[in-house]
């Protein structure tokens, strides 16, 4: 039976490239001169650490990160910005968590949406992905179009299309 998987994966190399591009832009921008500004990608625990001189620079850094992610085809919805925290040196820091995988709640919403569509397909939650199977590839393509039209709060990719 034809099937495909609905997943949420982040291309870490592209995210690394986006972070490096932000670092280069910070080095060349006039408003970041003579201020401490850091951006680091921690691949192991899937987070980005931001450090800036004040909240205005932090917002600018956040905007740059989001725009560079868009340029590198990384969906900024996978970035969860935590609260801005002051440091002891009068600066501000912020952690950005990189969300990968589909949570149980989102997976249940996806399955419910597929079942409500009355298409002849089955959806099953498997760890951090949703497997959709059906008899016809056309039905599976309709499901893909249906899910692309909805907003689930996480970017969705459709992989492993097997006929």
Swiss-Prot record:
Keywords assigned by UniProt, alphabetized: Nucleotide-binding
GO annotations of cellular component type: cytosol
Coiled coil: none
One Pfam family, short name: DUF520
GO molecular function: nucleotide binding
Record has Flavoprotein as a keyword: no
Annotated InterPro entries: DUF520 (IPR007551), UPF0234-like_C (IPR035571), UPF0234_N (IPR035570), YajQ-like_sf (IPR036183)
CDD domains on file: YajQ_like (cd11740)
Stored NCBIfam families: PRK05412.1
PANTHER family: UPF0234 PROTEIN YAJQ
Family membership: Belongs to the YajQ family.
Role according to the record: Nucleotide-binding protein.
Protein name according to UniProt: Nucleotide-binding protein DvMF_3058
Biological source species: Nitratidesulfovibrio vulgaris (strain DSM 19637 / Miyazaki F) (Desulfovibrio vulgaris)
């Amino acid at each position: 039976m034809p099937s495909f998987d609905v997943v949420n994966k982040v291309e870490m190399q592209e995210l690394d490239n986006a972070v490096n591009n932000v670092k280069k832009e910070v080095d060349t921008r006039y408003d970041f001169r003579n201020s401490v500004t850091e951006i680091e990608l921690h691949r192991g625990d899937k987070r980005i650490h931001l450090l800036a001189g004040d909240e205005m620079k932090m917002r600018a850094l956040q905007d740059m990160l989001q725009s560079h992610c868009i340029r590198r085809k990384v969906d900024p919805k996978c970035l969860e910005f935590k609260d801005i925290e002051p440091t002891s040196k009068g600066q501000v820091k912020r952690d950005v968590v990189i969300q990968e995988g589909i949570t149980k709640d989102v997976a249940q919403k996806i399955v419910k949406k597929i079942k409500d569509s009355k298409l002849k397909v089955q959806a099953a939650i498997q760890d951090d992905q949703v497997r959709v199977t059906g008899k016809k590839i056309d039905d599976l393509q309709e499901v893909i179009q249906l899910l692309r039209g909805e907003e689930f709060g996480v970017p969705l990719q459709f992989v492993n299309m097997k006929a």
